[in-house]
Amino acid sequence: MKENKGRKAFSEQGECSLCHNIKPIYNRRHSGQNLCKDCFISSIEKIINKTISKYDLLTPIDKIVVGVSGGKDSITLLYNLKQIQEKTYNAKPLSAISIDEGIENYSSTRLNIVKETCKELNVELKVVSFKEYTTKTLDQIVAIQEKHESFRYPCNYCATIKRRILNDLAKELEGTVLALGHNLTDVSETYLMNILYNRLHLIARGNILRKSSNLTDKYIDRVFPLMKIPEHEIELYVNLKKLKYYGPLCPFRKEHPILRKRVLHFLNELKKTSPEIEFNLFNGSLELLSVLGEKYKETAPHYCPKCGYPTPSPTKCRYCSL
């Protein structure tokens, strides 16, 4: 009943909650605001700026490297960081990284959008492929691995390789921070996944905040400036701004029902009656981080005998074990 009442109230609302001049096009259910196009766009950009400021994600002297896939999130991130960089006195130029996984009928189309966007924004772009790094495309890796009993979802292999490439390239480009397009929905999903798998040590790391390791210089700092914006709002923003992006999901994600997909469905069901649920999860993760910080203090890691990267055991790291 309450939900229907809320919809009715929105349909009868004749003005934007912020400017009070124009008819609204969007009802932000978690705040109760009805927003016109311009106020909605402005609110998204303000949230990004406020998130960066509140959580100390970036500094004026940072050399920012942006991971860009060509999807709605990374395009939104790149566009907004470019605007911020242009308004920041003496700011270093942005650089972007995009990765060609070698997925048939997917990677090349997506990369064309990335190249076009970076050219329009005058952002340096570095493209590297899985094949350059591993001698194989993701299609080839999956074809080999799925013959073994130990086969895991393609996403596991892809994520491991991408993390390494992004980190290595960002350092190669002399970046001080790697900015990625993880949104509030992504952060909430990951938090729930870590709870479900009892990975409290990962929550304790505080990966959603900028945090440098005192024990290794192998990793570049990572930040998520979109982490306070729900996925559906980013989709609306990028369409209202008419920013070109690649919409189709990765074919492997569609073919393989990974747990993350089920968690997303669960979250979307909860949001129907509790639109603030993702914000509650975000705030809860920060509170739990402060509690777990003492228990899971950073300890001296082992190092992979092959690549020298930190690893939890004396054996090869996950990347080198692929």
Where are these regions (language model features)?
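Flexible helical/loop "lid" subdomain adjacent to adenine-nucleotide binding pockets
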Residues: 45, 53, 63, 185-189, ...
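ATP-dependent adenylation/nucleotidyltransferase module used to activate substrates
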Residues: 2-205, 228-240, 317
